[in-house]
Amino acid sequence: MKYLYLITTEGCQGCKIMKDILVNNFSNIRIRVQDINFVPLWIKTNIKLTDFPTLVFIKNDIIRYHFSGTKSARKIKELIETLQF
């Protein structure tokens, strides 16, 4: 199973923007949005979470890629193609 895991924090305007971008442009991919306080430990130990939003590409319970900050839908689509996600 593959999914995009958006890690957010309270009061983060960029997090809201990224959530909207994902929901409106990637209905064919499972999307999970979670506040940093509820992110599973296995993700927290594999990624240094210092900036938000952070988008994690997970496939078969393996982190394939991640980035922090906001990106356009076009850039995310390019990443999905490059990663063959």
What are these regions (language model features)?
Residues L41-K48, L83:
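Short amphipathic alpha-helix with an adjacent loop that forms part of the alpha/beta core around
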Residues L4-I7, L22, I31, L55, ...:
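Hydrophobic beta-strand residues in large extracellular and virion-surface proteins
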Residues N46-V56:
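Structural micro-motif
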Residues M1-S27:
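Local sequence-structure signature of Cys/Sec-based thiol-disulfide redox active-site neighborhoods
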